[in-house]
């Protein structure tokens, strides 16, 4: 077997917020990738606007550095469970991995998932205990917990023999022993050269598995992946083997490799390289691009099943078409099906209604990122409340179940216990550090997590962190009754006035400001009772020919509650929708007319 000793391919994997992207920043900066006078932002790999806003990695990305004459291809992966499909998709390009574990939090749900994926692929692991500069760091305990995780997941005895490094990605230092003085990030790079095996070069003609796609308005589709056999050059002929076994022949236009944040145009790339090629138009992630003389397909990428679903529909509100650039069924359908090309965890199905589509994903965040992306692109549509995806196994209804881990303070245990018991959660473990901080671990149905994140943040007053990961399927435990209060629903269309809002605020909280355009059936607030209340938010104060000296003093209003997209999705009930446009996020009833809603309630009672 031939090896390419001039290359190492390594993936950086971890739970969300354990410091992957910050560590990549340090590797890039200390490898002299940037000019000395060049300003470089933090988390430079998270170039997407939503990634920067939310502080998480959403899409996996490739970069490369040169160190001691060896090119190190680095694959930065997401840490959030909702984007675990990205990890499954790209981890096959690597020969080794850096597993980052927070020195305080220790192994978390996604740590187990990403390590399991790495072990199944046979990657050589390097454990990096990150954020060692934290005062609360508990090194020995975290190392023991991580070693137990390796013992549970290792598929070969070799995977139990791994080095341990200690790092502070924010400070750009790493060390092989605790107590050493960290000077730079070089110990990690030296360990990669020593531990991660060089790519094995199998004999044969060109063969590449497409693990990612990009698009350029001038170059068209860009296929990204690792070359497993042979070599490729511009103007070479190749065939693309898709999931159906069909083969289409193309001529390669350009071949790129990675260095820093750039793609470099090259005349030739060989087995072991991670490349991007143009000229292959009809290609999907998981396809094999190969030599026409020997078109052998590589095993396709297997991605886990989605766990929640919701409908996307054409906007049917009275304000439809006013604020969006893309509003039609054709445009919405084309955009959703186009997303399938690079978002492997997503599923899209047509429904009986021509203007409504069923979209399935790995979690609320997974789908909300898609919704927000489409909103910013100019799409206008409406979405329903998410639901857990059930399936029937041997005649029994099964539902997805997840592990929920919460870090908070002792004072929040009571309220969280009450909230989660109403959502069919079972407490499986609890750890108290003796300083007022607790770690709670629950097993909970996915349906019990829908809408919980917003309530969790409110109950803990922001003093808590929650993480989840899917465990599998268990028998259906029954429906969960909504505990949400009733809403205030606009009974007339028009412009919301201060007098009308003041009247509404006597009944509850409002969601809109004065001078907001509203329509009948739009949700404008909430109150404490369980029933919905129709209210005329456009009501004016009656005029008389007699005025007192204080009659025209302006009305004092409580500031409106403004929902983010995620909060709006969490808030709605089954009979409600979120109207999404580039300019506004509105809540509404599915049936806008008050009389239609009454008839619907009456007919359901008769059916019961």
Where are these regions (language model features)?
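Short glycine/threonine-rich beta-strand-turn micro-motifs
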Residues: 168, 351-366
């Amino acid at each position: 077997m031939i090896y390419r000793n001039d290359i190492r391919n390594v993936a950086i994997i971890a739970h969300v917020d354990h410091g992957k992207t910050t560590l990549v920043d340090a590797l890039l900066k200390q490898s002299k990738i940037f000019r000395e006078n060049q300003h470089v932002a933090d988390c430079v790999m998270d170039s997407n606007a939503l990634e920067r806003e939310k502080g998480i990695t959403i899409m996996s990305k490739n970069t490369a550095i040169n160190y001691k004459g060896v090119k190190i291809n680095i694959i930065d992966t997401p840490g959030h469970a909702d984007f675990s499909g990205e990890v499954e998709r790209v981890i096959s390009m690597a020969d080794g991995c850096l597993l980052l574990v927070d020195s305080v939090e220790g192994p978390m749900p996604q740590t187990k998932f990403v390590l399991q994926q790495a072990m199944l692929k046979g990657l050589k692991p390097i454990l990096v205990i990150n954020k060692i500069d934290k005062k609360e760091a508990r090194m020995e305990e975290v190392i023991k917990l991580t070693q137990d995780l390796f013992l549970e997941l290792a598929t070969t005895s070799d995977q139990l023999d791994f080095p341990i490094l200690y790092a502070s990605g924010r400070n750009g230092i790493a060390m092989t022993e605790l107590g050493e003085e960290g000077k730079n990030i070089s110990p990690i790079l030296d360990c990669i050269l020593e531990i991660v095996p060089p790519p094995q070069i199998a004999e044969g003609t060109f063969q590449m598995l497409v693990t990612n796609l990009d698009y350029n308005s001038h170059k068209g589709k860009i296929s990204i992946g690792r070359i497993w056999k042979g070599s490729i050059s511009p103007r070479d002929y190749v065939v693309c083997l898709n999931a159906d076994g069909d083969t289409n022949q193309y001529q390669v236009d350009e071949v790129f490799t990675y260095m820093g944040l750039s793609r470099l145009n090259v005349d030739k790339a060989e087995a072991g390289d991670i490349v991007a090629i143009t000229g292959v138009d009809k290609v999907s992630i998981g396809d094999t691009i190969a030599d026409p003389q020997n078109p052998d397909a590589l095993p396709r990428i297997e991605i886990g099943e989605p766990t929640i679903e919701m409908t996307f529909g054409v906007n049917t509100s009275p304000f439809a078409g006013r604020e969006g650039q893309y509003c039609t069924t054709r445009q919405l359908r084309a955009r959703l099906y186009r997303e399938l090309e690079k978002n492997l965890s997503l599923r899209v199905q047509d429904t009986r209604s021509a203007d409504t589509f069923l979209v399935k994903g790995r979690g609320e965040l997974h789908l909300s990122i898609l919704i927000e992306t489409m909103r910013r692109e100019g799409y206008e549509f409406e979405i329903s409340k998410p639901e857990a995806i059930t399936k029937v196994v041997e005649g029994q209804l099964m539902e997805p179940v997840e592990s929920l881990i919460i870090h908070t303070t002792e004072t929040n245990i009571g309220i969280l216990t009450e909230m989660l018991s109403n959502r069919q959660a079972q407490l499986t473990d609890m750890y108290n550090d003796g300083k007022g901080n607790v770690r709670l671990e629950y097993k909970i149905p996915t349906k019990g997590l829908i809408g919980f994140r917003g309530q969790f943040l409110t109950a803990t007053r922001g003093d808590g962190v929650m993480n989840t990961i899917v465990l599998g399927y268990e028998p259906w435990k029954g429906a969960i009754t909504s505990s949400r209060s009733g809403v205030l629903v606009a009974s007339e269309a028009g412009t919301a006035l201060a007098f009308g809002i003041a009247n509404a605020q006597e009944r509850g909280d409002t969601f809109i400001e004065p001078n907001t355009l509203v329509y009948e059936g739009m949700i404008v607030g909430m109150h404490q009772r369980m029933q919905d209340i129709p209210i005329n938010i456009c009501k004016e104060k009656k005029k008389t020919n007699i005025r007192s000296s204080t009659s025209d003093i302006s009305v004092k209003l409580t500031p409106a509650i403004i929902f983010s997209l995620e909060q709006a999705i969490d808030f709605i009930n089954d009979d409600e929708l979120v109207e999404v446009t580039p300019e506004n996020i509105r809540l509404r009833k599915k049936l806008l007319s008050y009389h239609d809603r009454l008839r619907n309630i009456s007919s359901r009672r008769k059916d019961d």
